[in-house]
Amino acid sequence: MKVIYKYELARTITLPINSQILKAGMQNGIMYIWVLVDENEKQTYYANFEIIGTGHSFEFDYLTHTYIDSLFDGPFVWHIWNVKN
């Protein structure tokens, strides 16, 4: 059965295989991602993320990373990227 779970965003998160990252967002000052998962899936993988602030340089692109979302945190904006496995 498919279900959407919320995970607190970190540099690395353990997710069920074949899961789909739907959205990133802020709740009460904490960064989260919402992920569509098969709750019967037992195999997992490590999903890795990069969190880049507006105006900060980085050296990756769409070939190695997938853009997820931008999060607004008061005067800061954070851009969330998933590292492709």
Residue ranges and their predicted role:
Residues 1-85:
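Catalytic phosphate/metal-binding cores of nucleic-acid and nucleotide-processing enzymes, i.e., regions
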